[in-house]
Amino acid sequence: YRLLTALTLGTLLWGCTESGKKAEGPFYIDIESRAQLHDWFRYAPERPIVVSGHRGGMVTGYPENCIESFEKTLSMMPSFFEIDPRLTKDSVIVLMHDATIDRTTTGTGRVSDYTCEELQQFFLKDREGNVTPYRIPTLEECIVWSRGKTILNLDIKDVPLEVMSDFINRLAPANVMYTVRNARQARTYLDRDPQAMFSCWCKNMKEFGEYAEERIPWSQMMAYVGTMMLPDQQELYGKLHEKGVMCMISLAPT
């Protein structure tokens, strides 16, 4: 309850000025270098709560994994976004959480059964199933749009690690980070991109030790610790904070 109250309050505070008046958006986060990205996620006890838009936000009329939805969220508060890259039949990286397009578009079938051009015939749907005028974006379109506006956290689905790493290295965006589920994944990315920033699954002291063993720089990670802060994991949170690592929980239903 306390955490939810703090999150709600933090969200409200983002939209207010010192005079108590509502600030007007958009609320952009301008990251110009990897070093600045690392610093942005540095833990400090006095720092206000940071909000991550799960799949970009889920406002009625605005679909998940959609640039227009990201803009809508940023019109209300500063946020970084967790998004879901997938490969099309012709190896273009697009944004889609599910393996199929049934739930979130007017089409049916697997993402990998369509070329990127073929996917553009379908319209995205919001969380209530309402059809919107928006279409499936490519990851490259999203990255180009995001520069000077926000941070993108890639929760990679079926894109091979080497393909994604080469893609990111080619575009060299300062404001993009990777979600990794274990230390070995982080090390593999780091070997190909030494300045990479990570959202690391780190839910217990065993996993904490594995990141240390793989020599993942603490300055280049944020720790996803689960759906809530647990009393029996206080040692973990303390160790992460000692290393300057920000902890993240998820309040999204899926």
Describe the role of every protein-language-model region.
Residues 5-12:
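Bacterial N-terminal signal peptides
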